[in-house]
């Protein structure tokens, strides 16, 4: 607190989070001080290493691609991941990825509310990460229930994370709060559409969903009903994408 009081400048990792910490919900008891120091408070977005996260040169993925070739080549990574994880092998399946710590902060209670709606015959879900036993077991359950559609990988691997970013059509990240977030940036780098909750750096780095042309998805998924709307869009996208 003393540092915040006497600092010449205060930074955090996104403009939206800089605004959020001025409120009681996000401020952790320091929201009054944040409001008092608002003239000195700025958000500076995190970034990723474009050389490390580069689908054109990434040695961790089966098929390299770029902005000109991704429509033809990206699906080869999907088929390879389907084979590796024992999912139904069909490049037309709409594959959603989650690479995350499995905790309440990541909004997984919202995902739990719509898992059955998401897991239609045309959708596959790949989960990578560890965390709370509740969520680890939840994804294990759905892996058992929808064995050819859900793959729960309850561990973390840098190699596997790159494969998920490269293989998936969409990346699900409905965080309760997210000062900045990096996974959505990695997904974007690999041409994988982030579906995120409108909070913190997710709001600042992912454009809102455009209902007229279907481009990008950041959505106000603060409730289960809002998440159900997202599941409808996911199912629609799985049936209409080219």
Residue ranges, per PLM feature:
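Catalytic cores of nucleotide-sugar-dependent glycosyltransferases that transfer UDP/GDP/TDP-activated
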Residues: 1-242
């Amino acid at each position: 607190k003393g540092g915040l009081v006497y600092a010449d400048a205060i930074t955090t990792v996104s403009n939206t989070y800089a605004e959020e910490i001025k409120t009681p919900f996000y401020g952790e008891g320091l929201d009054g001080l944040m409001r008092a120091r608002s003239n000195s408070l700025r958000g500076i977005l995190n970034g990723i290493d474009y050389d490390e996260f580069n689908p054109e040169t990434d040695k961790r993925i089966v098929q390299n691609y770029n902005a000109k070739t991704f429509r033809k080549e990206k699906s080869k990574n999907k088929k390879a991941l389907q084979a590796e994880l024992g999912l139904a092998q069909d490049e037309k399946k709409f594959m959603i990825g989650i690479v995350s710590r499995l905790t309440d902060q990541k909004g997984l209670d919202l995902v739990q509310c719509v898992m059955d709606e998401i897991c239609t015959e045309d959708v596959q879900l790949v989960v990578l990460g560890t965390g709370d036993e509740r969520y680890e077991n939840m994804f294990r359950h759905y892996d058992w229930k929808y064995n050819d559609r859900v793959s729960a990988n309850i561990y973390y691997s840098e190699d596997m994370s790159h494969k998920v970013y490269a293989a998936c059509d969409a990346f699900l990240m409905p965080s309760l709060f997210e000062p900045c977030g990096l996974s959505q940036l990695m997904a974007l780098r690999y041409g994988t559409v982030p579906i995120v909750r409108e909070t913190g750096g997710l709001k600042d780095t992912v454009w809102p969903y455009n209902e007229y042309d279907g481009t990008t998805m950041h959505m106000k998924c603060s409730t289960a009903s809002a998440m159900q709307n997202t599941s409808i869009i996911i199912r629609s996208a799985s049936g209409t994408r080219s």
